[in-house]
Design a protein with these regions (language model features):
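Non-catalytic signal-transmission and effector/linker regions of two-component phosphorelay proteins
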Residues: 1-18, 24, 124-140
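Two-component/phosphorelay signaling modules centered on CheY-like receiver
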Residues: 24-44
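Acidic catalytic/metal-coordinating carboxylates
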Residues: 48, 74-77
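Active-site residues of response regulator receiver
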Residues: 67-68
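The feature encodes the CheY-like receiver
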Residues: 71
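Short amphipathic alpha-helix used as the core "switch/output" element in two-component signaling
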Residues: 76-89
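Alpha4 helix (beta4-alpha4-beta5 surface) of REC/receiver domains from two-component response regulators
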Residues: 77, 99-117, 121
Length: 140
């Protein structure tokens, strides 16, 4: 039986997404393509590892979307830091990157990444997943 995501939305509580992406153009493209999903709100952004870690420690988000290469630091180190902070609430972790090697996938899984999408071709799959999340669907 697939695990159930602990995110259910209502008109009062949208699914809060935090996006870690260093390219303004890519960040804009992601938001432009996903922002119209009912029940989803982009509640935070960062383009560096240090800034993302600071914001993630200060706020609660339901979904975290990481790029691997960042302006400062990288998404894998950020995931490592988050996993070493057990007081943070559990969030759905997604890597959305053009670095799609199996090594990155394995390391991401070690730090709680549930989904890994290729930035160059899988934006529709990311959208479909987030649509499921906003409906409170069970995800495998």
């Amino acid at each position: 039986m697939p695990p159930t995501l602990p995110v259910a939305t209502t008109a009062v509580q949208p699914v809060r997404v935090f996006l870690v992406e260093d390219s303004p153009a890519v960040r804009e493209l992601i938001v432009e393509n996903l922002d119209d999903i009912p029940g989803l709100v982009f509640a935070g952004f960062s383009d560096t590892e240090a800034d993302a870690l600071r914001l993630l420690r200060q706020n609660v988000y339901d979904v975290l979307i990481f790029d691997i290469e960042l302006r400062q630091g990288n998404g894998i180190s950020l995931l490592r830091s988050l996993s070493a902070t057990p007081t943070l609430p559990d969030s759905l972790k997604i890597i959305f990157s053009n670095n799609v090697s199996s090594a990155y996938r394995r390391v991401g899984e070690q730090y709680g990444v549930r989904y890994f999408f290729d930035k160059t071709s899988e934006l529709p799959k990311l959208r479909h997943l987030l649509e499921q999340v906003t409906r409170g669907a069970a995800l495998s």
